[in-house]
Amino acid sequence: SGDLGAERYAKMCKSCHGADGSNAAMSRALKGLPAEEVKAALIGYKEQTYGGKKKGMMERVVKSLTDEDIEVLATHIGTF
């Protein structure tokens, strides 16, 4: 699933967050965040229960993610 997570990250996240998650994008860097925290944030964005003033971008990005997508992305990002 690591490869799938890397593919999803490259397609959906890298342009704003950087190859290794170190770009702050509109909020903060992803590098160093535990997978569980990333997963909770992605679910929160999808359910529109998480995020600050600029959450609209992330809500648009995650709305099409499946539970599996969220799991593999969180696991991949947790390795940064």
UniProtKB/Swiss-Prot annotation:
Its main location: periplasm. Keywords: Electron transport, Heme, Iron, Metal-binding, Periplasm, Transport. Heme c binds at C13, C16, H17, M58. GO terms for cellular component: periplasmic space. Disulfide bonds: none annotated. It is found in: Periplasm. Pfam families: Cytochrome_CBB3. It comes from the Bacteria. GO terms for molecular function: electron transfer activity; heme binding; metal ion binding. InterPro entries: Cyt_c-like_dom, Cyt_c-like_dom_sf. The keyword RNA-binding does not apply. PROSITE patterns: CYTC (PS51007). Binds 1 heme c group covalently per subunit. Natural electron acceptor for a formate dehydrogenase. This is Cytochrome c-553. It comes from Desulfomicrobium norvegicum (strain DSM 1741 / NCIMB 8310).
